[in-house]
């Protein structure tokens, strides 16, 4: 499974979802790779120190002689590895302009891993540019985090249009796993209303699991840990493990 975590809006829990879904998959004994395609590198520094990152996804994608395997680093969590990002990744789109295979760079690099990882999770940048398209072309599945806030559905049409364009030609096998509602505060009427709106737009694509707003989820990256080791008894850990279970169920349901 190669799952891209994408939403063109920032602040929707995209990186938190990528980090903790990857960790949950690894904890199930599956060798898992987290690929950071966001120049902000928040997924990377959720597990690694800056000074440990010598080469990044920029090098692996932009340089023909650099393999993805050359940049991958282990984390303290067994079975979890990271292909880290650096701020230089922001220059990649300009670097690849005009290259005929620009949309296939990541897909080709992943192919060189020869199935070493059972699961790959890709943290996309909050934009619908070349980096996100590379992730969608490489992925088998797409997961969309959506915060239960007033502007939750803003830009949804653009995202769905991009997904459809990718499915029409470069990656017809791409499947939308679903939409997960994040940072949900069930105490507020607004959050409940937005949740209903998301269900109206996406219907059965919405995961049953809802990620509640939880301070532990915000704190864990500062300690270079996933929520499962930082606060294993927290609501955040329960929610993300439940999401992982649902993801696996949906993937298996479509492959049997």
Map each language-model feature to its residues.
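P-loop NTP-binding core
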Residues: 1-256
């Amino acid at each position: 499974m190669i799952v891209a975590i994408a939403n063109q809006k920032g602040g929707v829990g995209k990186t938190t979802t990528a980090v903790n879904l990857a960790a949950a998959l690894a904890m199930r004994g599956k060798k898992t790779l987290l690929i950071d395609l966001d120049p902000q590198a928040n997924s990377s520094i959720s597990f690694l120190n800056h000074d440990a990152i010598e080469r990044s996804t920029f090098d692996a994608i932009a340089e023909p002689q650099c393999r993805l395997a050359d940049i991958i680093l282990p984390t303290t969590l067994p079975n979890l590895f990271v292909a880290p990002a650096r701020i230089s990744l922001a220059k990649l789109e300009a670097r690849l302009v005009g290259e005929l295979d620009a949309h296939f760079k990541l897909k080709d690099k992943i192919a060189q891993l020869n199935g070493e990882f059972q699961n790959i999770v890709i943290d996309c940048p909050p934009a619908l540019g070349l980096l996100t398209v590379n992730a969608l072309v490489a992925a088998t599945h797409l997961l969309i985090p959506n915060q239960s806030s007033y502007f939750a559905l803003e830009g949804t049409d653009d995202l769905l249009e991009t997904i459809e364009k990718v499915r029409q030609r470069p990656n017809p096998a791409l499947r939308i796993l679903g939409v997960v509602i994040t940072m949900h505060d069930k105490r507020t009427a607004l959050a409940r209303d937005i949740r209903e709106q998301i269900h109206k737009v996406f219907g059965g694509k919405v995961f049953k699991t809802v990620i509640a707003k939880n301070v532990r989820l915000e704190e864990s990256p500062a300690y270079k840990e996933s929520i499962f080791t930082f606060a294993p008894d927290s609501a955040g850990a329960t929610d993300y493990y439940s999401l992982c279970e649902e993801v696996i169920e949906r993937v298996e349901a479509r492959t049997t």
